[in-house]
From Swiss-Prot:
One of its GO terms (biological process) is translation. The keyword Ribonucleoprotein applies. PANTHER family: 60S RIBOSOMAL PROTEIN L23A. This is Large ribosomal subunit protein uL23. Part of the 50S ribosomal subunit. Contacts protein L29, and trigger factor when it is bound to the ribosome. One of the early assembly proteins it binds 23S rRNA. One of the proteins that surrounds the polypeptide exit tunnel on the outside of the ribosome. Forms the main docking site for trigger factor binding to the ribosome. SUPFAM superfamilies: Ribosomal proteins S24e, L23 and L15e. One of its GO terms (molecular function) is rRNA binding. Belongs to the universal ribosomal protein uL23 family. GO terms for cellular component: ribonucleoprotein complex; ribosome. The keyword rRNA-binding applies.
Length: 98
């Protein structure tokens, strides 16, 4: 896989109450990823960027909600999330990552 493509796959970590709960309970980390990212690409990107070993990747597509803006109807953007499980003894410290 192209290293340049792998650098663009992961957009941001998801920092929500639910993501924190999942991280503590299942030792998984949630990331927002590009819409056309595949599981092998996500795994390779996490291993390249954070220097950790990935055990598994679970992916979900969240549809954007329909919202009203005054008299106009709009739509929030859809997003793709990846829950990445790290191998035993591995962890990512976001404070150290540059």
């Amino acid at each position: 896989m192209n290293a340049e493509r792998l650098m663009q796959v992961i957009l941001a970590p998801v920092v929500t109450e639910k993501a924190t709960f999942v991280a503590e309970k299942n030792q998984q980390i949630a990331f927002r990823v590009v819409a056309d990212a595949t599981k092998p690409e996500i795994k390779a990107a996490v291993e390249l960027l954070f220097k950790v070993q990935v055990e598994s990747v679970q992916v979900l597509n969240r549809k954007g909600k329909v919202k009203r803006f005054g008299r106009f109807v709009g739509r929030r953007r859809s997003e793709r999330k990846a829950y990445v499980a790290l191998k035993e003894g591995q962890e990512i410290d976001f404070a150290e990552v540059k």
